[in-house]
């Protein structure tokens, strides 16, 4: 039986008021065709335009950026998988098709200076063009839809507008294009039936040429009347968020100057906003822009957290660092964005906000400078932007991506990101317990299980274990958000995502419901609590390995009685000379510099399924050089992103390994885990090695322990990595005690609860539980969800039976 002791009279600190929030990034068609419910794909006809400086290859299937990063393109249709799975037929203008009409992009006759092309259509009599939307144009009986377009022609041209499928017309309207310059034409439709995959058609009875500069088809009913998809925004509201981070994410950085996110390109009339290619494999119209994000935050009652570009493209995609002029321009763009949000209505950018319908300033409390940026190039840019911003807006809370590598970065909050396996998050429950309280506060801005059990219940419970760690450390962990947030089910760039939808339906993965439980049951103060819980050991398996500093020599490696040879090098190559192996360090240009030592690694043999065994080798000890041996090394499963990345991905690269290493350094022996940063899992033990000679090293893995021997003497027995089977945290208010209990084991676990106050016998339990692989789908949207249970039997001392793989929130009423 586990045990939880709660001392409500010992208030540790107030809860962090903004702890649980949202992170929006336009990924997997989260914007156009998603939260921004534009129904016409490629509404400005620009999807097939290559970003400046990029060159197509593979017959147009991919392009290469100016710095060498590869993206899937397919003439603007995006990922190869989308084209295949969605059965996209070839067309010169993505999403648009013609029947008895000729289409071409016109680069000269454009609607305004921000539009790069128009669609020139020569209709034969009775010809038409049609748009297939985001795998169909959705229709729902009785619902209203609004259409508008900018068009021009040399003569009066009557056009028929229809929403149809296989000859069935769901709505129709007429538009008469007047001769002369560009003009806007509007129409309204009332759906005469329901469909998921209709098409929008523009037909012409005459033989004539028409130019189309911009088109749009949107539902009339939107969230609070502000233009966003209602069911998706309601799901955001119902998760009880306190803030929203936007607009990214990697799209803030882009992979070239053209693909960088600039505030100025996302405000004003939507037909005047330049589109731009996102590094998530498609072009965004920027209809969902800075104003719309701020308005959504206001409508949800959450505080905005704006992420600005710091002056570079994505460091994980062959970065380009802005020159002095470009950097100054970016600083100006950031200041203009802040003026748009916060400035008076008579300021330059505040006046545009007022013209957009919001005279009063928006609320904006947080500014994050950069996304996942680091190193010297980041540090000086961060300091430059921070100084400029705080001189004008001193109330802003400044968030950094990194704590500094060549110098300490002074910021209010530092943003940490984690993507990993379920066990990582269960073990991470204690990660912030030892966090330096003098360091910046913490924003866990992106985290999720994206390797094994993605989008399933076991992942949700593992993430909840991690969140228990946030609950316990709210004096330093101030903000947290899951990532990514949205995915159109037909356009996945990443998996998992919190909320998934097609054109008419939406559902949430199990994680959504654990967030709803945590975000809806906050309390007022974090109170003292202790727990006694069982542990679960990692299922460790793999190969022995040689490691240590560059040039360390080994000889005669033997695994389970048989000699073994080098099989692969990670940041290393093996130089073999007879029975000797020297570990030679290799540089990896894609490996960032870390403020800690990362040892090269040479694996031995091929049996990745081995879980126990004896490894022996001789190691030459040279003063000042570390010797290290890898214990059962194997790569983690690749995430969906890494499996589908057009840039080749080696599963044996260091970032996919979490190696346990026996390290002999400076006269001590210890075992450490490579978890970036490495952490010791054993106490350092003194050890004596013969200098300038070979020393015999041996480790034996048996059960949950590894025994270490040097020159025939056992020097230590170390317990292999484990994680707690359960995590608990407690908060209270004047009237209630709130207990969060997460059981990550596959067995029910009784919990003995000891309180220092009287409570009513009746209490409630918010519960999420099920089987490890349980998940939701469009046809079973709530196969996994939380329930509210009325329970009884509470008191100063009582027992709660935590179901296997469960998240429980107990609310007790004080008496």
Language-model region placement:
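Carbohydrate-binding surfaces in secreted/extracellular proteins
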Residues: 557, 617, 691-719
């Amino acid at each position: 039986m586990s045990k939880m002791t709660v001392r409500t009279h010992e208030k540790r600190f107030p809860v962090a008021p903004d702890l649980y929030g949202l992170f929006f990034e336009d990924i997997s068609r989260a914007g156009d065709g998603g939260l921004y419910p534009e129904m016409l794909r490629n509404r400005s006809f620009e999807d097939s335009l290559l970003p400046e400086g990029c060159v197509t290859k593979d017959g147009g299937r991919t392009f290469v950026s100016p710095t060498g990063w590869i993206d899937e393109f397919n003439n603007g249709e995006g990922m190869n998988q989308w084209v295949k799975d969605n059965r996209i037929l070839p067309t010169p203008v993505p999403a648009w098709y013609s029947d008895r009409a000729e289409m071409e992009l016109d680069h000269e006759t454009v609607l305004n200076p921000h539009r790069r092309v128009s669609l020139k259509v020569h209709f034969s009599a009775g010809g038409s063009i049609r748009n297939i939307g985001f795998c169909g144009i959705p229709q729902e009986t009785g619902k209203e839809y609004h259409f508008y377009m900018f068009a021009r022609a040399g003569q009066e041209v009557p056009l028929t507008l229809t929403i149809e499928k296989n000859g069935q017309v769901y709505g129709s309207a007429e538009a008469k294009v007047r001769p002369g310059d560009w003009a806007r034409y509007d129409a309204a439709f009332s759906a005469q039936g329901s469909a998921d995959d209709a098409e929008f058609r523009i037909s012409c009875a005459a033989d004539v040429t028409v130019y189309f500069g911009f088109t749009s088809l949107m539902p009339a009913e939107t969230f609070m009347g502000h233009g966003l998809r209602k069911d998706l925004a309601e799901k955001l509201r119902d998760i009880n968020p306190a803030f929203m981070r936007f607009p990214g994410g990697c799209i803030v950085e882009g992979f070239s100057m053209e693909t960088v996110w600039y505030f100025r390109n996302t405000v004003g009339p939507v037909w005047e906003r330049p589109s731009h290619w996102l590094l998530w494999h498609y072009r965004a119209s920027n209809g969902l822009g800075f104003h719309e994000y701020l308005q959504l935050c206001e409508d949800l009652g959450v505080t905005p957290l704006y992420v600005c570009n710091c002056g570079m493209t994505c460091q994980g995609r062959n970065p380009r660092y802005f020159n002095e002029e470009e950097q100054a321009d970016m600083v100006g763009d950031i200041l203009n964005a802040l003026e748009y949000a916060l400035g008076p209505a008579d300021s330059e950018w505040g006046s545009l906000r007022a013209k957009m319908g919001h005279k009063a300033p928006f609320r904006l409390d947080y500014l994050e400078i950069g996304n996942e940026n680091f190193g010297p190039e980041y540090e000086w840019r961060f300091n430059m932007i921070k100084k400029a911003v705080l001189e004008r807006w001193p109330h802003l809370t400044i968030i950094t991506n990194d704590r500094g590598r060549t110098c300490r970065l002074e910021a209010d909050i530092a943003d940490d990101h984690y993507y990993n396996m379920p066990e990582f998050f269960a073990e991470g429950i204690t990660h912030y317990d030892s966090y330096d309280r003098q360091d910046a506060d913490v924003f866990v801005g992106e985290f999720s299980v994206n390797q094994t059990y993605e989008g399933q219940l076991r992942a949700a419970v593992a993430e909840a274990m991690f969140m228990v760690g946030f609950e316990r450390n709210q004096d330093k962990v101030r903000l947290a958000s899951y990532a990514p947030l949205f995915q159109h089910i037909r356009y996945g760039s990443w998996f998992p995502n919190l909320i998934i939808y097609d054109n008419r339906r939406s559902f949430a993965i199990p994680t959504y419901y654990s967030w709803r439980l945590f975000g809806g049951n906050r309390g007022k103060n974090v109170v003292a609590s202790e727990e006694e819980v069982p542990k679960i050991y990692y299922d460790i398996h793999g190969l022995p390995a040689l490691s240590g500093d560059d040039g360390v020599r080994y000889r005669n490696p033997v695994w389970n009685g048989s000699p073994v040879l080098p099989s692969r090098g990670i940041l290393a190559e093996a130089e073999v000379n007879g029975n000797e192996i020297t570990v030679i360090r290799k540089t990896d240009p894609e490996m960032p510099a870390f403020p800690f030592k990362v040892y090269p690694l040479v694996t031995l043999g091929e049996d990745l399924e081995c879980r126990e065994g004896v490894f022996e080798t001789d190691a030459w000890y040279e003063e000042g050089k570390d010797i290290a041996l890898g214990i059962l090394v194997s790569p983690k499963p690749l995430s969906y992103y890494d499996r589908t990345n057009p840039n080749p991905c080696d599963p044996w690269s260091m970032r996919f390994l979490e190696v346990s290493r026996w390290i002999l350094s400076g006269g001590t022996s210890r075992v450490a885990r490579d978890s970036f940063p490495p952490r010791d899992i054993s106490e350092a033990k003194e050890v004596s090695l013969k200098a300038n000679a070979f020393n015999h090293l041996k480790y034996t893995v048996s059960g949950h322990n590894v025994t270490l021997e040097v020159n025939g003497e056992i020097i230590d027995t170390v317990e292999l990595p484990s994680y707690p089977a359960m995590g608990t945290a407690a908060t209270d208010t004047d009237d209630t005690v709130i207990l969060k209990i997460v059981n990550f084991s596959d067995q029910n676990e009784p919990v003995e609860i000891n309180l220092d106050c009287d409570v009513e016998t009746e209490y409630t339990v918010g519960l999420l539980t099920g089987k490890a692989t349980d998940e939701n789908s469009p046809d079973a949207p709530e196969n996994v969800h939380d329930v509210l249970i009325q329970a009884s039997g509470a008191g100063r001392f009582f027992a709660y039976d935590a179901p296997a793989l469960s998240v429980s929130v107990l609310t007790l009423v004080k008496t």
